[in-house]
Amino acid sequence: MTWLLLCLLAQYENGGKVLALSSSAKPYKTSVRFDPKTAHPNLVVSQDKKTVTWVQEAQSVPDNPERFNSTPCLLGSPGFTSGKHYWEVEYGNQRELAAGVARKSVKRKDHLRLT
């Protein structure tokens, strides 16, 4: 199983909206919701799970096995095993952003090397 992986690689200076996923008319559109159980403590997931915001002060969240705790990343769902998928990512003043795919076994407790 593979999931959409989003990582915020630099601080967002004034808070506010960092990422938002939207559906597209593309034939391979995939509706994605961010998984708050995987979100790094400095990432806040909106109630509708479509927006992520960087916050300066880390949230007090359980350090569950699914949570990224070193690299500011989170996973989107649902996962997939094959096929073509398309996402649109909107972001604000974030200087660095990485979007990709990750396996279930992605390292979450150590620094994540993005390739």
From Swiss-Prot:
Residues 1-15 form the signal peptide. Keywords: Neurotoxin, Secreted, Signal, Toxin. The keyword Signal applies. Pfam families: PRY. InterPro entries: B30.2/SPRY, B30.2/SPRY_sf, Butyrophylin_SPRY, ConA-like_dom_sf, PRY, TRIM/RBCC. PROSITE patterns: B302_SPRY. The keyword Amino-acid biosynthesis does not apply. It comes from the Eukaryota. Expressed by the venom gland. GO terms for cellular component: extracellular region. Residues 22-115 form the B30.2/SPRY domain. GO terms for molecular function: toxin activity. It is found in: Secreted. Belongs to the ohanin/vespryn family. Neurotoxin that produces dose-dependent hypolocomotion and hyperalgesia in mice. May directly act on the central nervous system, as it is 6500-fold more potent when administered intracerebroventricularly than intraperitoneal. This is Vespryn. It comes from Pogona barbata.
